[in-house]
């Protein structure tokens, strides 16, 4: 097989070794399967960027802590007595023992190392060292835990191991402005699940940051006219013309894709447009999301869709009617429902890749999220998290915890649509090891979010500033 020319280090890729050099629309598979590249990511990328460690609700009280692990680095996020949040490397300054494991709350207001009983105040200061006078020549300031930069946005706690990281809101641009009306910080978990996948973490991310795969993987979503649970039989070629158009929008540090009209559609889908104008057809799609995704539509929204399905066509588009009914039901049940114009809605709605590990699909009432974390040593494994957040009425927030399964196949509650993605992922990554596969050739309109993530990574790994 003829090798694919991805450029040379001196021609177009700066300091990027040829083995890892991307073309304009090409990404070599080595960036997904090489242990050496994984180590570069862990050493040069994850040590420099802001990354979501946990949700604020996971550390609700003073003394609450959450252990966030990325590669071999363990970071503890701790709620302070005044409600503020600090983060520290999770290593006792005596012999390196982890001070906390998992989640919990500091007993007596101190963080205690279980090895020799050293203690730290919630702000990281050394508060107790047995036989302190027997330690010689160590300055007092070196006894404290080493702090990690921490900040909050949208209800997430972000951490950065960089010595001088950019301001968090600057790093997140344009998300804070685009998503402000949705008030993500006021959402709470509806459910959350975690498992391990036999794939590189980017293989999994890539499956959730482009919509080009929709007709091939999720053909049932092309058939709302069939009802809330349409057929998932593979789509014939002629049905692909009705696939959603999902152009990607690259930003400096992140990306987004949206659903919109295909520029060249003409009149070929006029029949589909007539179907979409029928309230029950749009309602079927919303009901499907509730029944087979378990997110993007709340239980209230599901009732709104059922109500919409009984209505006759009118001058008001079903999409607008649906949102009106959703808001009316939410307000009637005491939900502090976010207020926004349709312009604001479309500016924030969509599928966001919050580089490097978080993907969120945002609606007014709820959010579907994914987080993918690399394995510390194996580029062919990763942690996969899937969760749903929601705006609840006071007193209605459910108690949740992470449902953890060793193999995703051991849990039958993923829903039809996520299960289709999960079935693909193992096979996608396995195929990357084929001698007949060189790398990813990307759709220039609907898959450039993937190219953008590699351009962002190259800034940190190789010092090359691309066009992202």
PLM region spans:
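Non-catalytic accessory segments flanking enzyme active sites
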Residues: 20, 25, 30-76
């Amino acid at each position: 097989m003829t090798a694919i020319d991805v450029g040379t280090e001196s021609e177009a890729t700066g300091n990027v070794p040829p083995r890892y050099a991307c073309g304009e629309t090409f990404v070599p598979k080595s960036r997904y399967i090489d242990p050496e590249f994984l180590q570069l990511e862990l050493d040069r990328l994850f040590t420099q960027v802001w990354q979501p460690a946990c949700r604020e609700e996971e550390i609700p009280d003073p003394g609450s802590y959450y252990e966030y692990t990325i590669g071999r680095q363990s970071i503890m996020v701790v709620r302070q007595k005044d409600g503020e949040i600090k983060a520290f490397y999770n290593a006792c300054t005596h012999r390196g023992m982890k001070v906390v494991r998992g989640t919990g709350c500091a007993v007596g207001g101190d963080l205690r190392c279980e090895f020799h009983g050293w203690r730290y105040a919630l702000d990281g200061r050394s508060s107790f060292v047995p036989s302190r006078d027997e330690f010689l020549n160590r300055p007092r300031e070196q006894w404290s835990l080493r702090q990690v930069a921490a900040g909050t946005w949208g209800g997430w706690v972000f951490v950065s191991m960089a010595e001088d990281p950019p301001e968090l809101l600057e790093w997140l641009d344009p998300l804070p402005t685009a998503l402000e009306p949705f008030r993500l910080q006021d959402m709470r978990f509806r459910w959350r699940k975690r498992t391990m996948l036999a794939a590189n973490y980017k293989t999994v991310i890539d499956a959730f940051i482009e919509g080009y795969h929709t007709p091939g993987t999720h053909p049932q979503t092309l058939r709302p006219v069939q009802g809330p649970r349409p057929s998932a039989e593979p789509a014939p070629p002629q049905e692909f013309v009705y696939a959603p158009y999902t152009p990607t929008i690259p930003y400096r540090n992140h990306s987004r894709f949206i659903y919109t009209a295909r520029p060249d559609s003409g009149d070929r889908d006029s029949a589909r447009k007539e179907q979409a104008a029928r309230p029950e057809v749009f309602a079927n799609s919303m009901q499907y999301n509730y029944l087979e995704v378990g997110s993007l539509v709340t239980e209230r929204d599901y009732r709104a869709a059922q109500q919409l399905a009984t209505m006759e066509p009118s001058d008001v588009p079903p999409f607008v009617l649906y949102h009106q009914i959703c808001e009316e039901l939410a307000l009637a049940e005491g939900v502090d429902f976010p207020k926004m114009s349709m312009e604001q809605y479309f500016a924030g709605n969509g599928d966001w890749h919050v580089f490097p590990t978080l993907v969120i699909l945002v609606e007014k009432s709820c959010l579907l999220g994914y987080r993918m974390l690399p394995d510390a040593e194996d580029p062919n494994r990763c942690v996969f998290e899937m969760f749903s957040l929601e705006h609840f009425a006071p007193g209605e927030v459910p108690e949740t915890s992470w449902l953890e399964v060793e193999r995703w196949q051991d849990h039958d509650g993923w829903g039809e649509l996520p299960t289709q993605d999960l079935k693909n992922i193992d096979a996608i990554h396995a195929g990357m090891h084929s001698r007949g596969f060189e790398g990813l050739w990307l759709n220039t309109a609907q898959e450039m979010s993937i190219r953008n993530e590699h351009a962002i990574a190259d800034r940190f790994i190789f010092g090359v500033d691309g066009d992202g």
